[in-house]
């Protein structure tokens, strides 16, 4: 598996979720299964089957998060030069087809939130922009077709991961 770039915030978020699953959720679901098992016939015990399904989900999530952590590449974007688009860059782009401006910050996949302008480094937009410079024209394949953009600015600003 490839390295997964992320900020320290993203890494800490994943580690906290993994800890919660291992130390709280997993023991709780084991108790729920034991309680449900005590309710009799397991073939028709909906509570037992629901708890077992939840346990499978928790265990799968633990495996996924453990893989992400094992492959994490924590990057401090504040120390990178942002003369070209890279991880942690905030990019202001102009859609040349409709003259609309957009601003995006490139983050790790676990940190992305397009509604806040935080796009994953693996997204089609980010892939098209990474390595480009201010003033470059870029064609980006979007869901509604290809659009042409101009990079107006590239800079670093502290990333706001406000979780509210």
UniProtKB/Swiss-Prot annotation:
A GO term, aspect molecular function: RNA polymerase binding
Q: Which Gene3D superfamilies match?
A: Transcription elongation factor, GreA/GreB, C-terminal domain (3.10.50.30), Transcription elongation factor, GreA/GreB, N-terminal domain (1.10.287.180)
Has the keyword Electron transport been applied to this entry?
Answer: no
DNA-binding as a keyword? yes
Q: Which cysteines are joined by disulfide bonds?
A: none
Query: Which domain of life, per UniProt?
Result: Bacteria
Biological process according to GO = DNA-templated transcription elongation; regulation of DNA-templated transcription elongation
The alphabetized UniProt keywords are: DNA-binding, Transcription, Transcription regulation
Against Pfam families, the record matches this protein to: GreA_GreB (PF01272), GreA_GreB_N (PF03449)
Described purpose of this protein according to its UniProt entry? Necessary for efficient RNA polymerase transcription elongation past template-encoded arresting sites. The arresting sites in DNA have the property of trapping a certain fraction of elongating RNA polymerases that pass through, resulting in locked ternary complexes. Cleavage of the nascent transcript by cleavage factors such as GreA or GreB allows the resumption of elongation from the new 3'terminus. GreA releases sequences of 2 to 3 nucleotides.
Q: Which NCBIfam families match?
A: greA (TIGR01462), PRK00226.1-2 (NF001261), PRK00226.1-4 (NF001263), PRK00226.1-5 (NF001264)
Q: Which family does it belong to?
A: Belongs to the GreA/GreB family.
Q: What is this protein called?
A: Transcription elongation factor GreA
- The scientific name of the source species is Helicobacter pylori (strain Shi470)
- Whichever gene encodes this chain, its name is greA
């Amino acid at each position: 598996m490839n390295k997964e770039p992320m900020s320290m915030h993203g890494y800490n978020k994943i580690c906290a979720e993994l800890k919660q699953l291992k130390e709280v959720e997993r023991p709780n679901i084991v108790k729920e299964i034991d309680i449900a098992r005590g309710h009799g016939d397991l073939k028709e015990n909906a509570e037992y089957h629901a708890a077992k399904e939840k346990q499978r989900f928790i265990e799968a999530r633990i495996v996924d998060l453990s893989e992400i952590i094992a492959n994490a590449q924590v990057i401090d974007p504040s120390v990178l030069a942002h003369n070209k688009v890279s991880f942690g860059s905030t990019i202001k782009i102009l859609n040349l087809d409709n003259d609309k401006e957009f601003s995006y910050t490139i983050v790790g996949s676990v940190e992305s939130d397009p509604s806040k302008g935080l796009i994953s480094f693996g997204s089609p937009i980010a892939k098209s922009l990474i390595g480009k410079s201010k003033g470059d024209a870029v064609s980006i394949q979007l869901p509604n077709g290809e659009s042409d953009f101009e990079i107006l600015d590239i800079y670093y600003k502290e990333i706001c991961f406000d979780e509210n």
